[in-house]
């Protein structure tokens, strides 16, 4: 792969000591050596390009003393410098606590064999090979081609074979002793699938400047992050799926996106929830006249729905008024008679019975809705010469007509009262004070009543 051309090694060459295994809490572990990817190429300024005892002698000469090492990483294709202190007191084997072998780091990441499926009870299963996470990186002999491993297996039929295996889950290398056996009862001599080539290389993590190397001892009890290769560069979790909706629905989606689900309901729903009727109400002028009307009796009904007896006021002090008959010719069509007594006035005392020929009994109006015609009750309607219910629909009253009706009633009271009674005079004075401008209609009605009485 030409890794030696990517970085210039002091002293030249592409050889070094390949780090296969790093023991936890060892001097090599504390120095940050990474298994499989690191190659020790120099120590204390001495280039290690030959397989001899130079490394051992340098380590023994610097026991319990820090020395500098130059390390080449096949992962990052860079050189780095590390300080290590050889020691016999750290509690493990060796001065550094690492397993190494002398080899070339040129193409170290390419000459690997990926362990695929492992058959049960096969030589590979008995040796402890793990499917898909194990990579055979070498043996005691040099292997630079894909056929080198298979040739080595054939020459070790029924004989123990030592292999160096790197595991991506543990991020460490180990020695595996396997005995090839073509008669194990399955296919092949190992009973496992072997992959070689670009698609079966060890996945590497991108190098980050200043990144601290994590070792197996530091990964205890923590989940292992999957490594990435050339086919896992895309992070599927961060990719937004493309829109699958037809192009024609884009405008509809944009218009619907502006709708607010939490918007306030229309004002109509608020009106309906409060119980306000939605039918047309009375004209504004009628509403103004009704603003001062006292509260309605709950038993009363609308004027168009008969009867209204439940809403009529109780006037027990006027029993004799039913004997009076108003002259029919003087009732004005289309005009309703308002009430005689307003709220706050004292009740009228009882008047002596008097029968005036040609005058119908005076009906009693209601205390509310003075703009609608009133309907007489049972016996009063039977005795009346001309029932008011047969009259045409009446419009809203005007003040002059209401004053005329009140003046007519007061004048009639004056004609029939006895000279000794003074209470009706009080009623006449109150009515006349309220309507001083209507003197002429009052006198006309009084003359007509006097002529009729005579």
Curated annotation (Swiss-Prot):
Main location: Golgi
Lipid attachment residues per UniProt (N-myristoyl glycine): 2
PROSITE patterns in the record: PDZ_GRASP (PS51865)
Chain residue ranges for the region called Disordered: 377-454
Mod. after translation: Myristoylated. Myristoylation is essential for the Golgi targeting.
Domain of life where this protein originates: Eukaryota
Residues that bear Dimethylated arginine: 30, 47
Protein name, per record: Golgi reassembly-stacking protein 2
Organism, scientific name: Rattus norvegicus (Rat)
Lineage start: Eukaryota, Metazoa, Chordata, Craniata, Vertebrata
């Amino acid at each position: 792969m030409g890794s030696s051309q990517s970085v210039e090694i002091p002293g030249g060459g592409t050889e070094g000591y390949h780090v296969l295994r790093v023991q936890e809490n060892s001097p090599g572990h504390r120095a940050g050596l990474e298994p499989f990817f690191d190659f020790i190429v120099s120590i204390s300024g001495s280039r290690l390009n030959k397989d001899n005892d130079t490394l051992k002698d340098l380590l023994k000469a610097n026991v319990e003393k820090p020395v500098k090492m130059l390390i080449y990483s096949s992962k990052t294709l860079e050189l780095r410098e590390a300080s290590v202190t050889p020691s016999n007191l750290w509690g493990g084997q060796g001065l550094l606590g690492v397993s190494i072998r002398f080899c070339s780091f040129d193409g170290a990441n390419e000459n690997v064999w990926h362990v695929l499926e492992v058959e049960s009870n096969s030589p590979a299963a008995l040796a402890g090979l793990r499917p898909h996470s194990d990579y055979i990186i070498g043996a005691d002999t040099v292997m630079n081609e894909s056929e080198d491993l298979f040739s080595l297996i054939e020459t070790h039929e029924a004989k123990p074979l030592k292999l160096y295996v790197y595991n991506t889950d543990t991020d460490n290398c180990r020695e595996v002793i396997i005995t090839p056996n073509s008669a194990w009862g399955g296919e092949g001599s190992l009973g496992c699938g072997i992959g070689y080539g670009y698609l079966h290389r060890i996945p590497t993590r991108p190098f980050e400047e200043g990144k601290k190397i994590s070792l197996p001892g530091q990964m205890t009890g923590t989940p292992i992050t999957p490594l990435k290769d050339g086919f896992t560069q895309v992070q599927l979790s961060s990719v937004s799926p493309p829109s699958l909706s037809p192009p024609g629905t884009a405008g509809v989606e944009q218009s619907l996106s502006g709708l607010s689900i939490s918007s306030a309901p229309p004002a109509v729903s608020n009106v309906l929830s409060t119980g306000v009727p939605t039918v047309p109400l009375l004209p504004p002028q009628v509403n103004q006249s009704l603003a001062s009307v006292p509260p309605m009796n709950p038993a009363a009904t609308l004027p168009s729905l008969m009867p209204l007896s439940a809403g009529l006021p109780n006037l027990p002090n006027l029993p004799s008024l039913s004997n009076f008959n108003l002259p029919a010719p003087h009732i004005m069509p289309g005009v309703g008679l308002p009430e005689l007594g307003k709220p706050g006035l004292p009740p009228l005392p009882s008047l002596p019975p008097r029968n005036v020929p040609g005058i119908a009994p005076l009906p009693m109006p209601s205390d509310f809705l003075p703009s609608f015609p009133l309907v007489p009750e049972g016996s009063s309607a039977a005795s009346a010469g001309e029932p008011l219910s047969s009259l045409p629909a009446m419009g809203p009253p005007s003040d002059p007509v209401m004053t005329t009706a009140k003046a007519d009633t007061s004048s009639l009271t004056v004609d029939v009262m006895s000279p000794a009674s003074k209470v009706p005079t009080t009623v006449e004075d109150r009515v006349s004070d309220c309507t001083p401008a209507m003197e002429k209609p009052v006198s006309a009605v009084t003359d007509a009543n006097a002529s009729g009485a005579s």
